[in-house]
Amino acid sequence: VGATPLEMREDRHFLCSRHEFAVHARGRKQLRMEYFYREMRRRHRVLMDGDQPMGGAWNYDADNREAFGPNGPGFLPATPRFEPDVITQGVIELVETRFAAHPGSVASFGWPVKRAQALQVLHSFIDERLEHFGRWQDAMWQGEPWLYHAHISAALNLKLLNPREVIEAAEAAFRTGRAPLPAVEGFIRQILGWREYVRGIYWQQMPDYAQR
């Protein structure tokens, strides 16, 4: 039997290719996410006003470190949850059988497993929680594990959502007055900054990086 040719292609669910990250890192004594993030903002024209960042600052992290008062966060919109279908239920049973000793639980699994469900979760975040995400993105409150977060990491990594559409949805919320700039910038920084940067570091410096 003849060999089957294998073609390796770039993952289209990241906006920075491995080559582009290597070019960014070339010649730098130290890698900083902030500088990479600014480069990505310029390249993809995200939250830009001409050649300058929207609002005059690249990073609004200083505005995004508030704590809840003594009464806590107050009303929190519910995040969409989904009843497992036949396929998902089968996978849950498989996990419970083969990986019973692993940490975690699938007893209350309700995450999106279809694109339409993932879009529903994204739109719920944009419409109901994004405006408050920035101020309290680092805050914690006992008994409230989700607060104003988006719950889309799994959907992104499973390719049910594309990072570009997530970023565009958040930026549109700012430009139409539905969410303030610090909240939108803080959220976009997680997607266009940290997610892309950590992936770039992984491909460039692993496995040695894990031992530092």
Locations of regions flagged by a protein language model:
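Beta-rich, aromatic/charged-enriched effector core domains that present basic-aromatic interfaces
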Residues: 1-111
